[in-house]
Amino acid sequence: DEHGDSLAFTGSINESLTAWKNNFERFKVFLSWDRPRDVEEEQEAFDRLWENAEPGWATVNLPEAVKQDLIKYAPNEPPTVEPGLGPVVEESIKSRWIAQFLRDAPYLVQDGWKVGVETAALDPFPHQRSVAYDVLSQFPCKKLLADEVGLGKTIEVGLILRSLLLSGRINNCLLLVPRSLVKQWQEELRDKFLVDAPFYDGSKFVYFEGNTTRSEPLPSGRDPWRVHRVTLASAQMAKMSGRSEALLNSGEWDLVILDEAHHARRRDFATLNRYRPNRLLRLMEGLTERTKALLLMTATPMQVHPIEVYDLLRLLGLPEKWQDPHSFMEYITSLRETDDTTWGTVFSLLDSSIEHWGVDKSWEESCGRALGPVGRQRILNAIDFGNTSAVYSFKDSEREWLRQLMRRQQPVPWMTYRSTRPLLRQYFDQGLLKQN
């Protein structure tokens, strides 16, 4: 139109008797001001057909078609049954209603994104459902999933991804995993969550089907990172020179997921003044600027040095005052309850944390019961006004509650989900696990 806006549509709305009884009809409309890339792709596909440049298709203008008498190739009688179709198997009306409801429900009810969690082909543990709900209620967000091995981080991500796709809250997702886990990821997403995640190996798309594989060539003229809604790739391939640049230049993402995120790390820890990220960490620094949401997965966020945790949290978006690695490490050191606590740094970072996330509700309630509202407010006022000298006039009980606040207000509890193996024992005791 006069404003440069356009729309594109694909599909058909066939209202014949055959279509109503036998077909699945789909009609999609894309708006340039909402999904410009989709409009561009439809335009490019049409142009290839129109210009006779699409492999396997021939485009002939009408005068030429008349001249060649192409109509003679049409059958004398219209087909009554489409070639290749077997007998139509009638399905129950109830099943069709249920299937249609699952497609429509996320758009019809409040918190419709829960439909994806509750209709997955498994019954998640309480902590898995809790993580999925929390991420989905905050989406788009950037979080670290750090459950211990065996607690189901993959299940949590599958629930989240299924819900986001079913509710239309994301249009694209990049999933980076170790090469050795690609097959497991693809099969688990398909079998448990009905999420199709083609594996892009750098030259083609691969589908694992039991003991066999099926390959799909890359479409000509299209960015391979933008062909499918969910793209599964190995982190090893993505971080390679040349590959990483192409990935970073491919555009914005709605969601990026990195499994075994602890492999994104700096090369040495001898001094904080020398920052040398490895290729994966450098890639993730670029991707976090190009995605609305980010999920990092690792059971071991710290392997050698606490600065490894800082590097992962920085990808998720630390509050401003926490972004300095020296201040971060000073604060972490202060949690050990030593006599040389740098209260100026601690109060500055605490104030930044409270401003960013608010006061931890559990601490606020428990401290209020233990010290009363006046004692609790003495602690909060000292932090708010940066009155570090007040610490030395605190009672022992007030100082202990200050220490508890320091532990709860650091970024890790706010940005990380972590469940540990003793939780499995609780599930066993509650009858949620059949064997220990």
Language model: regions and residue ranges:
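Charged, low-complexity
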Residues: A53-K143, H228-V230, A235, G251-D254
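SF2 helicase/translocase NTPase motor core
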Residues: Y107-H127, Y133, T154-E156, R162-G286, ...
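Walker A/P-loop
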Residues: P140-I160
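Conserved helicase ATPase motor motifs in RecA-like P-loop NTPase domains
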Residues: T288-H305
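A short helix-turn-beta junction within AAA+ P-loop NTPase domains corresponding to the substrate/partner-engaging
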Residues: V309-W322
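Conserved helicase/translocase motor-coupling segment
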Residues: I379-N436
